[in-house]
């Protein structure tokens, strides 16, 4: 079982000697939506993530949306499916099922949750917000090499930062979400690829959503 350390479930230490490497749009997408990231995971196992949310515009949503997200497997009609469940206080809510062969759907859940949260908090069209976020996922970026402590050992990581509304003409009307940063940290040594997926508005002062790898349970 692997558990990340520190209060936020993981600690990323950027390696100062290694500069950020530029990626074109396709390379950014391929790193974020990497294929085959579930292939080595036993179909009897469960990947468990922790979602922590703070929202100063709608404080009540923080408690509502904070909890565990579990990824388990089930056999579909034509293929194995990865099922996502929100778990809190002994209650389970299915979030969706996705073909396991494609990769880890946690990133899709992450950005859809951010789109929903932003639309609910700041107003505006969720379709407009989603389109800006999706565009950010295929833009050129820089990947930051680093390390993280996982289960008491140091592992190599890569982090991509995205700012969907940096040049948006409406950003000043977004109640702090105009400064939204999406930050995805991945590692070959973390089951399921994603170590953390973080969204921060106004540096976290307005809104923060962190989805962090917690553990691999050998059985569901």
Which residues make up each language-model segment?
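Acidic, serine/threonine-rich low-complexity disordered tracts
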Residues: 21-100, 121-220
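Surface-exposed, glycine/proline- and aromatic-rich loop segments on solvent-exposed faces
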Residues: 92-117
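Bacterial N-terminal signal peptides
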Residues: 7-15
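Bacterial N-terminal signal peptides that target proteins for export
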Residues: 1-6
């Amino acid at each position: 079982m692997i558990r990340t350390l520190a209060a936020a479930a993981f600690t990323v230490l950027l390696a100062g000697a290694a500069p950020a490497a530029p990626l074109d749009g396709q390379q950014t997408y391929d790193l974020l939506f990497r294929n085959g990231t579930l292939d080595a995971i036993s179909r009897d196992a469960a990947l468990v993530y922790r979602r922590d949310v703070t929202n100063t515009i709608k404080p009540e949503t923080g408690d509502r949306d904070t909890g565990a997200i579990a990824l388990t497997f089930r056999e579909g009609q034509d293929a194995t499916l990865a099922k996502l469940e929100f778990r809190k206080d002994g209650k389970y809510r299915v979030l969706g099922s996705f073909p396991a062969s494609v990769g880890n759907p946690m990133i899709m859940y992450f950005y859809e949750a951010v789109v929903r949260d932003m639309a609910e908090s700041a107003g505006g069209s969720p379709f407009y917000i989603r389109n800006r976020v999706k565009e950010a996922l295929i833009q050129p970026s820089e990947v930051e090499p680093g390390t993280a402590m996982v289960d008491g050992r140091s592992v190599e990581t890569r982090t991509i930062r995205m700012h969907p509304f940096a040049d948006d003409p409406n950003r000043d009307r977004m109640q702090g979400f105009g400064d939204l940063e999406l930050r995805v940290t991945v590692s070959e040594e973390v089951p399921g690829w994603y170590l953390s997926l973080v969204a921060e508005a106004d540096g976290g002062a307005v809104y923060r959503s962190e989805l962090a790898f917690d553990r691999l349970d050998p059985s569901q």
